[in-house]
A protein has these predicted regions:
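Binding-site signature for planar aromatic cofactors or substrates
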Residues: 1-205
Length: 205
């Protein structure tokens, strides 16, 4: 990221910079936008937020991809109401970026199988092979057990389940809200979806 290059950006230049940073975050584990916060709506408890990992960005289609366990509460929430928002924050730049849109949940098809083929032989695959669903209560002895021990048990119990509970979340961005917190003066810009892309406007911070 380079804040100095945005000393006086046009909306077009700013929009291009934001997408470039998002694309970079999907490739760079150290990027501050690699782990945004995903907010969904739960009919029973209202807004729900959690940290996720940004996996892929397709600038041309304004699409961001995330992975999750299909049994996660957020999947049911998104199936009931696909509206969602990602919140990215960069402490180094003082930039906040909110990305709103609708999320499509996929548990079957090429979107899922092609990505699982790349993931299945990595350590991260164990996140989706557990016989226990995310959030399920467990005994204190299980909570205290070393992660390696649990992973080995889960691997043995679930080796029969190819692709298991792996799901892909595809967010189509409909709005981007950028805020720069700067001692010299805050700045804010909002970009809304149009057929040809995102149209932007400057706003009061």
């Amino acid at each position: 990221m380079n804040a100095t290059s945005l000393s006086g950006p046009t909306l077009e230049a700013l929009g291009a910079t934001l997408w470039r940073e998002l694309a970079g975050a999907a490739q760079d584990r150290a990027h501050e936008w690699r782990q945004p916060v995903l907010a969904t709506v739960c009919p029973e408890f209202g807004p729900q937020a959690r940290t996720v990992v940004l996996r892929e960005v397709d600038v041309a289609s304004r699409t961001l991809l995330l992975y999750t366990d299909a049994r996660s509460p957020k999947v049911a929430q998104l199936q009931a109401d696909p509206r969602a928002q990602l919140l990215c924050w960069s402490r180094a730049l003082g930039w906040q970026l909110r990305l709103g849109g609708r999320i499509l949940v996929s548990t079957e098809g090429l979107d899922v199988t092609s990505r699982w083929a790349l993931l299945r032989h990595t350590r991260a695959a164990q996140d989706y092979l557990s016989p226990q669903r995310p959030g399920q209560p467990i005994a204190a002895t299980e909570a205290d057990a070393p992660a390696e021990g649990l992973a080995e048990t889960e691997r043995a119990d679930s080796s029969r389940a190819e692709r298991a509970h792996f799901a892909v979340l595809r967010l189509r961005v409909e709005r981007m809200d950028w805020l720069s917190l700067d001692p010299q003066g805050h700045r804010r810009a909002v970009f809304d979806a149009r057929d040809a892309g995102l149209s932007g406007r400057w706003c009061v911070p």
